[in-house]
Amino acid sequence: MDLSRFLDRSRGQCRADVAVEALATGVSTPTVYVLDCDGYYPGFNFLFGLAQPALRTAVVFTARLRGPLFAERLAKEIVHESGHLYGLGHCSNPKCVMYFSNTLLDTDRKTAYFCERCRRKLFARYLNP
C-alpha cells in the first residue's frame, strides 16, 4: 500500500484521521488496518492507533511498537482499536487493553485482554441486547 497519501512530509508522519477516512471506503464490517509508519493526529505528537467507530475503521501504526516485544505490542494495539470499533472507550484500569497508552511503557504494562468492566460492557451490548 502506498502510504504517501497519508504522509505529512513536514513531520515525517502519517496523519491518522486522513488514513482512516481514506481506508474506510467500502468497509462494511469493523476493520483494523496495520500501517508501517509513524502516526499522529493534530494535538498529539504521535499515536499508536486511531479508531473511528462511525466509519467502522481503525489504524494501528507500527513505527513506535518495534523492539523485542513487537508482536505483543501490535496485538494489544489491534485489540485496543477493535474495542473502540465495538463501542468501548478508554478504561481507567492500567492492566486493561482499553487503557490509554501515552507511552510504550503503558502498552507494555497492560495486558492484551479486556478487564471485567469492559467485558461486561461488550457482553451487555452484543450478547444481551
Where are these regions (language model features)?
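Metzincin-family zinc-dependent endopeptidase catalytic domain
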Residues: 1-78, 85, 89
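Generic, low-specificity signal for short hydrophobic/alpha-helical stretches with a mild N-terminal bias
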Residues: 42, 80, 97-100
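Metalloprotease/metallohydrolase-associated module, dominated by Zn2+-dependent proteases
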Residues: 47-73, 88-129
